[in-house]
Amino acid sequence: MQNTGHSYSSGKWLVRPGSEQEFIERWTSFIEWTLNEAPGAVSFVLVRSTEEPSKFLSLGAWESQQAQEAWREMPQMQVMLGHCRALCDEYDTYRYTLAARLGR
């Protein structure tokens, strides 16, 4: 993931056992929609726990906090998010700003 965004979004997902593959497909569709329809969306990753395969963490980079907030207010965003959440027992979301950047 490029660290070009000035704002970051994350999701902590606990997917119902047996629904993991469908969740990955729905999340991918949600993020493809986001990248096509939400100005300022930069890049996203979804990682999965190796110890508990029903736990996922998503991280998205945004050009600005305003772009992220505009996306959150889009009616279709709530619909697409709902498709993912329907497969989860727990979901939390967070907003972040860049604190440090390292890399090669």
For each feature predicted by the language model, list its residue ranges.
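Short flexible/disordered coil segments
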Residues: 11, 72-74, 99-104
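Short, surface-exposed ligand-recognition loops at beta-strand->loop->(often short) alpha-helix junctions
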Residues: 14-25
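Short, well-ordered beta-strand segments in beta-rich or mixed alpha/beta enzyme
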Residues: 6-14, 43-72
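An amphipathic, aromatic/His-enriched active-site/gating alpha helix that lines ligand/cofactor pockets
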Residues: 29-42, 61-95
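Non-catalytic surface loops within mature trypsin-like serine protease
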Residues: 15-17, 64, 97-100
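Glycine-rich beta-strand-turn "strand-cap" elements at beta-sheet edges
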Residues: 1-6, 43-54, 80-104
